Each structure stands twice: as structure tokens, then as C-alpha cells.
């Protein structure tokens, strides 16, 4: 029951100041797999995947018979001028060979509503998913969740626009502060979401020493980058 032993990590590559998918490695790793979990946009890297990247993923997964789970919970937090492209809209193959998971919980700060939703366009997959949800009694939901989702998506545009502008301001502030006070720590500017990935390689410190530096010197308890690979 240690599920991570069944996983293959598809590592990203560093390219022009941003993480990108290593398609050559992906083609090899995907062979023999049954399922690919896509984080779109990527968390914590903040990458909004390009259409050509998503199209290539769709082609490879269709060829290898691999179902795609597309986690798009950060989609509503895509920062201008970037545009999020839902995986299922890339092609008919992507549409019929994927399950998309979304929720307003990240963008509208409402995880307590347990108001996620799933998009399945393939009728056979949808039926299998429904049977699984019913068997596990996970299909019940509650009325308040439905109302909160409707309110967020119907009346939350102005609030979300202001939220994105505020997030962008935070990113600009952190970037400017580090350039002035800690130039060896580089901000990987996210294209989506409120998470900022800090490149500390120029610090030339071990992971343990780096964690100690942030806690003892900077007085910041941050998520250790090593946990993300």
C-alpha cells in the first residue's frame, strides 16, 4: 500500500529561466504505465504549459494507452498575460483519454467547502468513475458546496481580478527584495498561482544547511524544495 513505489517521476528540465517538460525522457518513462498525472498549471513550479507541450503529451499517452489525470486546480490563478489551456480542449484524443479535476478552492480560498468537480467526456470512463464514487460513498456532496461554487464562478470575477493583481504585486515585491538584499537567491517567476519557487543554488549550501539558514537567519519556515524532487 505504499503507492509511491508504483510511481515514475517525470523530471522537468531547466530551460531559459523556467521549468519545461523533458519530452525525450517522458517518452521512455511512460512506456508500461497505465496513468499519467498532469499538473496543469504546474505546482509548485508555476508553469503554464504551452499548447504544443500538451498536444505532444496527448499524442504520446494515446499511443501508449495511458490515461491522463489532469489536475487543474490552479487554473483560475493563471497570471496575465499567460493563458491556461485545459488539457481536454487540446484535441479529440485528449478529450476522450483524460479526466480533469478542478475546484474553486485555491482561487477563491474555500477548501472547507469540499467543492471540487470532475470533467469526464468519455462516456465509458464517466460510468466507471460514477460507480467507483458510489461504491465509496463519495458522491453525496452537500447543498452549500453547490451554492458556493455557483456564487464563486458567477459573481467572483471582479474579486478574482483584484486577487491576481495582488498576487502579482507580491511576486514583484519578493523579486525586488531578494535582488537588493539576497542576490544569490533567484525568484523563478510563476506564470500561475501564488507560490514562488526560490532558486538557491548560488548559495552553495547543503539542503540541511539551507533549511537552517532560512529558519535561524531569515526566520522563515518554508517548504523544503527537496520534497518536490
Model-assigned labels for residue ranges:
Residues 127-134, 152-175:
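Structural signature of PLP-dependent enzymes
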